[in-house]
A protein has these predicted regions:
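Contiguous alpha-helical scaffold segments within structured protein domains
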Residues: 1-70, 143
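Glycine-rich, small/acidic residue-mixed loop/short-helix segments
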Residues: 55-146
Length: 146
C-alpha cells in the first residue's frame, strides 16, 4: 500500500499499533501522504482499494479478475471492504480509512461477509480462529448471540 501511495507524494507510515474494539483487537497502521499535487478524494480510491487485506498480491488484472471470480462464487458482495472517509471544510485535508467489513441487505436478509488475510507466513488454524472470533463479535453486537 505504501509503495502504491508513494506514486502520489511523500508517504509516512507510523508504527503498527493495536486498536481495541468491543470483542476484537485489530492492527492499525496510520499512513499519511503529502500529495505532490492537488487531488480529489475520488482519485485516491484506486490507490487504496483493494488492499492486500481484502484483495490480492500481486495486484494486477489477472489476480484481480481471479479475486472477482472467487467473490462471485462465494456470493461475497462486490463492495466488501472499501475506503471510507470525509473531507475537512475547505477541502485541503481528506481523511480516509480502509474499511475491511461490509453489510448487504436483500429483502428481509442481511449478509455480513467476513474473511481473513492469508499470507506466506499464515498459520491456517490461527486464521480460522480469527475468522470465528470476528463472526462471533458481530453476532453479539447484533444481539444474535450471547
Amino acid at each position: 500500500l505504501t509503495e502504491r501511495l508513494s506514486q502520489l507524494g511523500a508517504v509516512t507510515r507510523e508504527a503498527r499499533e493495536l486498536c481495541q474494539t468491543s470483542g476484537l483487537t485489530h492492527f492499525q497502521s496510520r499512513i499519511t501522504v503529502k500529495l505532490g499535487q492537488k487531488a480529489d478524494a475520488a482519485s485516491l480510491v484506486p490507490f487504496l482499494h483493494p488492499t492486500p487485506a481484502v484483495g490480492c498480491l500481486p495486484r494486477d488484472e489477472s489476480t484481480l479478475d481471479r479475486l472477482r471470480d472467487y467473490r462471485r462464487q462465494l456470493k461475497v458482495p462486490s463492495f466488501f471492504g472499501a475506503p471510507f472517509g470525509f473531507i475537512e471544510p475547505g477541502g485541503e485535508t481528506t481523511h480516509l480509512v480502509v474499511a475491511i467489513r461490509g453489510m448487504a441487505f436483500e429483502g428481509n436478509q442481511v449478509r455480513l461477509p467476513s474473511g481473513c488475510g492469508i499470507v506466506g507466513g499464515s498459520a491456517i488454524d490461527h486464521e480460522w480462529r480469527e475468522l470465528r472470533l470476528k463472526r462471533e463479535a458481530v453476532l453479539r453486537l447484533l444481539g444474535l448471540q450471547s
